């Protein structure tokens, strides 16, 4: 098991099993090489497809051509309308992708702007009122599903800032020597931001975009 300099709430660091991943290394690298959207230089041409994949994860099955039309027309969106709400999510992701592609570094200000772009017009006003300058100022429930013994929550809001700083330092210092390393780093970043859950909503979209 390999330790990552990202602490749990109990104080010890998270670990992952590289030995389980390495047998898949060749398959991972072949997949990345064969997938244009995973290579940053070609990603701009693949944005509609990635937006579609991002939405499918959250149960929104948009047609790829519809996504292209939404992006191309820059529609005026009424977020109170259910259909327009879906279109707003498409435009927000498009703006967030374009923003993150121009950034070389992920820092606190970059993360705040990225979240602003992704969440624009989509946050419940009651939750928006409890947002701080960067992160939430109250607890958040991730799941109330009955098959869990207890409510699943994010990191306590008073230490969110500190835990996001741990993640930003990891992003800054993590070194990738090959495609497999890059894949592992991206998955760790995705997981840890979800673990923190620094916002009331749009955590998944933000974490997937940061992990790009």
Where are the model-predicted features located?
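FIC/Doc superfamily catalytic core
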Residues: 1-212
């Amino acid at each position: 098991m390999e330790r990552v300099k990202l602490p749990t709430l109990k104080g010890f660091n998270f670990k992952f099993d590289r030995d389980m991943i390495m047998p898949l290394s060749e398959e991972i690298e072949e997949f990345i090489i064969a997938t244009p959207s995973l290579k940053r230089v070609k990603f701009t041409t693949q944005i509609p497809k990635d937006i579609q994949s991002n939405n499918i994860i959250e149960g929104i099955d948009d047609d790829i051509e519809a996504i292209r039309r939404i992006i191309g027309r820059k529609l005026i969106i009424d977020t109170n309308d259910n259909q327009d709400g879906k279109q707003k999510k498409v435009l927000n992701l498009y703006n967030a992708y374009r923003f993150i592609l121009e950034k070389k570094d992920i820092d606190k200000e970059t993360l705040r702007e990225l979240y602003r772009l992704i969440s624009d017009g989509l946050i419940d006003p009651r939750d928006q009122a409890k947002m701080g300058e960067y992160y939430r100022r109250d607890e958040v429930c991730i799941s109330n599903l009955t098959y869990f013994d207890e409510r699943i929550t994010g990191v306590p809001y008073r230490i969110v800032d500190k835990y996001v700083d741990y993640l930003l330092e990891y992003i800054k210092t993590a070194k990738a020597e090959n495609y497999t390393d890059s894949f592992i780093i991206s998955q760790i970043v995705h997981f840890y931001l979800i673990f923190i859950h620094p916002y009331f909503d749009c955590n998944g979209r933000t974490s997937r975009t940061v992990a790009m």
